Amino acid sequence: MEYNRAAAVAYAKKWAYGRNPAFFDFSDLGGDCTNFASQCIYAGSGVMNYTPTYGWYYISVNNRAPAWTGVDELYRFLTTNRGAGPRAVVTDLSQIRDGDIIQLQFSQKTRFDHSPVVVDAGNGTPNSILVAAHSYDADCRPLSSYKYINIRPLQKRK
């Protein structure tokens, strides 16, 4: 199934400053950014992967895959998935497209911390790329406005 980038972006813009009641809000449990990114990806793909432990799915707050809400877990799922559901590759920032995910690391003491969704890829530079996100709720926020030390652009392939 082809990834519907327009649907992912439309979802991101609709829910950037709100919470879809169909999904739990993880803001008080470590952050909601990857939950929001997963919702956007799902809006664009329409397919979940129900493989226990290593899949990517959300049924309820207590019945979800770690990849649905974890930054590094989402990365591992998207870049290694060979079954149902979305896939991605790490790419150069200049190749990023609307509906892709850009993961950010804010400190040497942590792994990657944040998973904003690209709503406008611009010309592929941090000043022109605009993202939507939860935890640090935003829509059309310039990527360059984040203070990150490392970046991981994930381009959706399916």
Predicted regions and their residues:
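N-terminal capping segments
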Residues: 1-69
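Residue-level marker of positions within ordered structural domains that often coincide
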Residues: 17, 41-42, 107, 121, ...
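Short, solvent-exposed loop/turn and secondary-structure capping segments
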Residues: 50-53, 114-115, 142-143
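Active-site-proximal beta-strand/loop segments in catalytic clefts of secreted hydrolases
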Residues: 52, 104-107, 133-136
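...with weaker cross-activation on analogous glycine-rich loops/strands in unrelated enzymes
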Residues: 58-130
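Glycine-rich, aromatic-bearing surface loops/beta-hairpins
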Residues: 118-119, 123-158
